[in-house]
Amino acid sequence: MLKISPLSDLTKNEFEALFSSYYQELGCEDDIAHLINEYILPDLLAGLINIEILQDGDTYAGFVIYQTDDINNEWNFKEGWGDIRELYIIPSHRRQGLGKFLLYTAEMKLKESGVNKSYCLPSEESEKFFIACGYERTEGYNAELDSIVYEKHDLSNKCK
């Protein structure tokens, strides 16, 4: 059975393992424990970001990190927009619709909070996924992350 729930003390260790796998897959050499303990968890506790973790039976299979861009947040690229910051599904669970399920969950929670539009800064490998979910490539570019901006103007628009 699939279950998506907000990150909690009970799932912190599983999230750390998933995030570590995600960063290794991206080829990042950052200190993952430092990132989680000094940036991610404090931002979560301050209400600046949201994290949902996906469980498939006994397996923790992925997560999504998202936020509403706000002037009070250190990362405020598009004021008032939803930002799908990170989305990860473990390799053994890919191509089963779980990424779309996580993305749709984040979008609906953003919509419930009054956000009507979202964007993402996908890697080249994930661009097709976001396009299939209704995001459109823009002329926007984020130099810090070396990424093209993709936008979705209707969060009622489900993934294909």
Q: Which functions belong to the PLM regions below?
A:
Residues 1-17:
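A short beta-loop-alpha structural element at the N-terminal edge
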Residues 16-32:
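Helix-loop element at the rim of GNAT/NAT acetyltransferase active sites that forms part
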Residues 28-53:
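Active-site rim helix/loop that mediates acceptor-substrate recognition in acyltransferases
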Residues 53, 59-69, 83, 88:
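Conserved beta-strand in the GNAT
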Residues 75-91:
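Conserved acetyl-CoA binding element of GNAT-fold acetyltransferases
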Residues 89, 95-108, 132:
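Conserved acetyl-CoA-binding loop-helix of GNAT-fold acetyltransferases
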Residues 103, 110-122:
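Conserved GNAT acetyl-CoA-binding A-motif
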Residues 112, 124-147:
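Conserved active-site alpha-helix within GNAT-family acetyltransferase domains
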